[in-house]
Amino acid sequence: NAAVASAVFASALATGLPQTANAQGSVFTAADVDESQFVMVSAPIGKGESSQLNIYEQRSSARPCFAVSGASPAVVDPLLASFDFTGICNRYIDGNGYSLRIGGDDLGTRYRLSVVKTGSDVELLAVPTRDPSRPTMVVARSGGPGNGFIKLNLEPGWKLMRRQYGKRTLGHLYVYRDGMPGSPGAL
């Protein structure tokens, strides 16, 4: 109905909310972060049979938010779970806190970030949600099999960035790369 479409369009203009994923990509930009203040973690769900992506950020030096030990895979101790981390740490645990971005395109509605345990590794995959003909991409790996809180290391070409609106940085992270893997100029 034309009246409903007009109302939705007017509401979008009034609120400034984007109407499509492509529009969303052009409304927001991406700003660099100090990646040494972040750790990407395969965090167990329930009894630990499956895992999800958590990203922890150290915002101040008041006390440590996480500790990393070992290698291949490294184990993460989420210290922030043991104190009120307000103003000290940030924790990003789902699509409200992070999404996939490639170049100028925010792919948060078209890809989900999923932790998958293989026989020899723990991988963070970008999996298409709407178009199964789109590629699944390996974004990060642990470097070996493991259970519990396992550190994920970004693959070459990927990095963390913060969502930006105009000159204002927002509390949303991008798992970012300049171009699609395998495309000309991509790492």
Regions flagged by a language model, labelled:
Residues N1-A2:
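N-terminal chloroplast transit peptides
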Residues A7-T20:
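C-terminal segment of classical bacterial N-terminal signal peptides
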Residues A21-A81, K117, R130-P132, G144-L187:
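Extracellular/luminal recognition modules and glycoprotein regions
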Residues E57-E123:
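Structured domain cores in non-transmembrane regions
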Residues G119-R141:
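Acidic, glycine-rich flexible loop segments
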